């Protein structure tokens, strides 16, 4: 349904909602932000019947928010009739692509219920960027995954992330090969259940055999891959692992560094700046403890720069 928009010359957009200049700016900086402010001004009475001021702000602070707000007006009654709470509507709509996600819940929700998914499951899947595609992917790939002994809970866990649709498709594509390579269904779910899960599964399929040949166990590989940026971390081990081992780091050390969000960057930082830190008296154990933290790459670079400045 098209977004209704009538310019009101006598009232600044957002004035009826008492938006501060900062709040207006927060909305305007998004794609379609001016349209969102105009829509709020024009549809103030209808919006405030179903949404609080905080709800409207939350939805409006995303790209294409006018369409999302219109979708709330279009579908709110249907959602209530199907047992969804207002909080569910806000969760689904408060993401990029919220309008499409709401429509997808209306279209696919009944079928998903028939397949055994609860309202809470549907909200969890839809409440992400790309939620509409993820709901459709559950319908498309769910039966195949069930036949392969993945539970409904597994499917929701995989689908309920940014990029969930791609992750489900990747499980269908790479799952059989990974199982033949010795990974369990639980391993595959763990790897897939992250933003970037599809890329992580592909990276395991691509680099897993090389890493196993170098002495890394599948448990280590699944553990590393099951983090945000897991695909990059596995590739970083393939690239930098041999050199780090030559410098006295053990595989356990490398896994410890890689097994974090930002693990790839941390490994690269140790590879590039480790020698300088060693020359300054830091032991490998010190460097590993420093690197095995989220955001460690920046800290290592900063420390190396400080040491360089003293020379």
Curated annotation (Swiss-Prot):
Cryptic repeat - repeat boundaries on the chain: 19-50
Protein name: Burkholderia TALE-like protein 3
Family as reported in the entry's similarity comment: Belongs to the transcription activator-like effector (TALE) family. Bat subfamily.
Cryptic repeat + repeats: 282-311
Keywords: Plasmid, Repeat
Physiological role: Does not bind DNA, probably because it has too few core repeats.
Residue stretches of each Cryptic repeat repeat: 51-83
InterPro entries: Ankyrin_rpt-contain_sf
Disulfide bond annotation, renumbered to this chain: none
UniProt gene name: bat3
Core repeat repeats: 84-116, 117-149, 150-182, 183-215, 216-248, 249-281
Domain of life, source organism: Bacteria
């Amino acid at each position: 349904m098209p977004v209704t928009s009538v310019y009101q010359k006598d009232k600044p957009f957002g004035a009826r909602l008492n938006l501060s200049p900062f709040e207006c700016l927060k909305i305007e900086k998004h794609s379609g932000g001016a349209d969102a402010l105009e829509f709020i001004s024009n549809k103030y009475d209808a919006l405030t019947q179903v949404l609080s001021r905080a709800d409207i702000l939350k939805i409006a602070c995303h790209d294409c928010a006018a369409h999302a707000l219109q979708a709330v007006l279009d579908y709110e009654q249907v959602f209530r009739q199907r047992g969804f709470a207002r909080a569910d509507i806000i969760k689904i709509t408060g993401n990029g692509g919220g309008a499409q996600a709401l429509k997808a819940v209306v279209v696919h929700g009944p079928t998903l219920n028939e397949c055994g998914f609860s309202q809470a499951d549907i909200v969890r899947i839809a409440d992400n960027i790309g939620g509409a595609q993820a709901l459709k992917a559950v319908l498309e790939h769910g039966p195949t995954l069930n036949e392969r002994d993945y539970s409904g809970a597994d499917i929701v866990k995989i689908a309920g992330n940014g990029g969930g649709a791609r992750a489900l498709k990747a499980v269908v594509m790479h799952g059989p090969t990974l199982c033949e390579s010795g990974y369990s269904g639980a391993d595959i779910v763990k790897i897939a259940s992250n933003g970037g899960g599809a890329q992580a599964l592909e990276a395991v399929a691509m680099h897993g055999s090389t890493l196993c040949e170098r002495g890394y166990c599948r448990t280590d590989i699944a553990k590393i891959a099951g983090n945000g940026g897991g695909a990059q971390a596995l590739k970083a081990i393939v690239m930098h692992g041999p050199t780090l081992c030559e410098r006295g780091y053990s595989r356990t050390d490398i896994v410890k560094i890689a097994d974090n969000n930002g693990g790839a960057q941390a490994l690269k930082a140790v590879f590039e700046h480790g020698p300088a830190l060693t020359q300054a008296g830091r032991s490998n154990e010190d460097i590993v403890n420093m690197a095995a933290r989220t955001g460690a790459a920046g800290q290592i670079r900063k420390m190396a720069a400080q040491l360089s400045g003293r020379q």
